[in-house]
Amino acid sequence: MLIVGPAWPLRAGGMATFNERMAYSLQEQGHEVEIITFSMQYPGWLFPGKTQLSDEPAPEGLNIRVLLHALNPINWLITARYVQQYRADYLILRYWMPFMAPCLGMLSFWSTILGSKAIRIALADNIIPHESFPLSRVLTKFFLAQTDSAATLSDSVRADLMALGYRKPSIRLKHPLYDNFGAPVDRETACNTLGLDPGFTYFLYFGFIRAYKGLDLLLEAFADERLRSQNVKLIVAGEFYESPDRYNRIIHERNLAPHLVLLTRFIRNDEVRFLFSAAQLVTQTYHHATQSGVTQIGFHYHTPMLVTDVGGLAELVDHDRSGYVCPPNPEKIADHMIDFLMNKRYAEMSAQVAVKKQEFSWEEFVRKLLSSGSPT
């Protein structure tokens, strides 16, 4: 079995983590698995972060082949030859943006032409990109034409798939838990490890900072005067993938600096469990979204979540039980933060998260993923 997508040594955040965790799960079920990752994923002018390479050790027990060049058609043919020679039963193609459509589509096309019998499954994070551009739909259609079936991680993305006219087998799967960052630790230990005062309540923004993820909404909400009487701080943990200027302007104009913990850099895997164990509420105030792996980290650590009612985010959180679902509006977001603090909702919501998380197993995910591409 071959998985094509970001993995170590790329520093690709949640997508690399997902692919590696999926490979482990497939191995646990007796499959021989190899991940083909990129030797070059993005040209420098397109990559907004500081570096594309991880300084963390390779994940143990995984076969990862650094082979695919996103912009080199000759390399696509070489990689397709490798796929054919590997004789995989399944070729899982991770798709998240139209920029990757020529590379992944031609790899799939050539591997079949060269004689590969692998069932080609598109595992699509997005069909309509967060930042659309001319030809994006054409490119996505081209990629999808080179697949035998498709799986999505939210109803909204599957609806986009259908809207593009995809008529091959498709399935909506539940995004499994990110349970590979280590076990939860007690809150005081987590705070002490991070150098935080455990006397405060902490809310958490986690992940790359991009316009669609709505950190601006969150900062505006956190400036609500009602929150100043509460002993609460917001942790912003993630690397800027755009200019920080507008966020810094909000922080300055709203005098938010004393109420923030800014960890605006790439977050290492060994830091994740401490951040989610220290936080009592994960805040995902997106302007628009498909789904987010951050939610699945929150589930693993039994941390309640506040999400905006956009895309697939609301599909996972039961409003007023495991968290809150609200409009992408600073005042409404602040209303729910106040409710969480004033009514001491953490314990009851955390208990509901612990129950809900049972729905998101990796074993069930990979079983359904493979069956989606099998002949009926």
What are these regions (language model features)?
Residues 274-290, 303:
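Acidic donor-binding loop of glycosyltransferase active sites
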Residues 145-185:
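Donor nucleotide-sugar binding/catalytic pocket of nucleotide-sugar-dependent glycosyltransferases
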Residues 319-331, 338-344:
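Conserved acidic donor-binding segment of nucleotide-sugar-dependent glycosyltransferases
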Residues 5-12, 24-86, 162, 170, ...:
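N-terminal strand-loop element at the rim of the active site
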Residues 196-213, 219-222, 235:
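Conserved donor-binding/catalytic core segment of Leloir-type glycosyltransferases
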Residues 345-359:
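A short, well-ordered alpha-helix in the C-terminal region of glycosyltransferases
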Residues 182-196:
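A short helix/loop element that forms part of the nucleotide-sugar donor recognition site in Leloir-type
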Residues 245-270:
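Nucleotide-activated donor-binding/catalytic signature segment of Leloir-type glycosyltransferases, i.e.
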